[in-house]
């Protein structure tokens, strides 16, 4: 098995593709409909650049900042994202990693872990809600997040229902039960060598 440490998102994506069932990876990596917004978002990173000032004597250097009153060690927030249950600890693992680096956790409404659990793992958690349902339903979601210790709300206004994919949406189980295990078994067995290698490394 390769070193558990990796330095880039591209390497994380390569490892995920090797280990996950094809349908799960396909749902994780693809955008809605033609995927135009996803491609535009990725392309926007190519338009950004850094011009570091390495010369000169600046006494205090730091990337820390504040967002909604929360202190960040660097200007990064974990975006609220679904499908994190591809890891057994799901959002809890991500929340702990973010807390370890001093950055907030954005928790999706479609998370596999509760806002109570995640807010306990990361004291700077922002809860994401969709602008759907009636006023009372929205108020209940906000109040639950507040009571759980969430420090802010991320409101998604441009999506309120499931969009299809032009290439077809893969089947993703809502829970891993016997039926789901049987259905995903062929895809898992196709990656059995990778899984056995990882299991052996954990046993030694």
Where are these regions (language model features)?
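Glycine/aspartate-rich loop-and-adjacent alpha/beta segment that forms the canonical ThDP
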Residues: 164-178
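Conserved protein kinase catalytic core
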Residues: 86, 162-164, 204
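Short glycine/proline- and acidic residue-enriched helix-loop micro-motifs
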Residues: 24, 28, 188, 193
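Glycine-rich beta-alpha junction loops
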Residues: 157-161
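N-terminal capping/small domains of soluble enzymes
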Residues: 1-147, 153
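Single conserved hydrophobic/aromatic residue that forms the stacking wall/gate
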Residues: 194-204
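Residue-level detector of intrinsically disordered/flexible regions characterized by low predicted structural confidence
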Residues: 153, 177-181, 200-202
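Alpha-helix-loop-beta-strand connector modules within alpha/beta enzyme cores
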Residues: 118-126, 175-188
């Amino acid at each position: 098995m390769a070193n558990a440490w990796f330095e880039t998102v591209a390497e994380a994506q390569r490892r995920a593709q090797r280990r996950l069932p094809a349908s799960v990876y396909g749902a994780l990596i693809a955008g809605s409909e033609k995927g135009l917004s996803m491609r535009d978002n990725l392309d926007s990173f190519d338009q950004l650049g850094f011009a570091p000032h390495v010369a000169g004597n600046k006494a205090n250097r730091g990337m820390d900042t504040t967002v909604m009153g929360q202190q960040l060690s660097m200007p990064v927030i974990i975006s609220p994202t679904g499908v994190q249950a591809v890891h057994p600890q799901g959002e809890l693992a991500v929340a702990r990693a973010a807390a370890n680096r001093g950055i907030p956790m954005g928790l999706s409404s479609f998370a596999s872990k509760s806002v109570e659990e995640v807010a306990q793992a990361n004291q700077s958690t922002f809860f994401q809600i969709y602008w759907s349902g009636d006023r009372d339903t929205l108020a209940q979601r906000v109040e639950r997040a507040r009571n759980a210790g969430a420090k802010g709300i991320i409101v998604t206004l441009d999506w309120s229902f499931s969009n299809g994919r032009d290439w077809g949406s893969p089947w993703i189980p809502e829970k891993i039960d016997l039926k789901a295990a049987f259905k995903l078994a062929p895809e898992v067995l196709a990656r059995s060598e990778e899984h056995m290698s990882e299991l052996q490394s954990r046993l030694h």
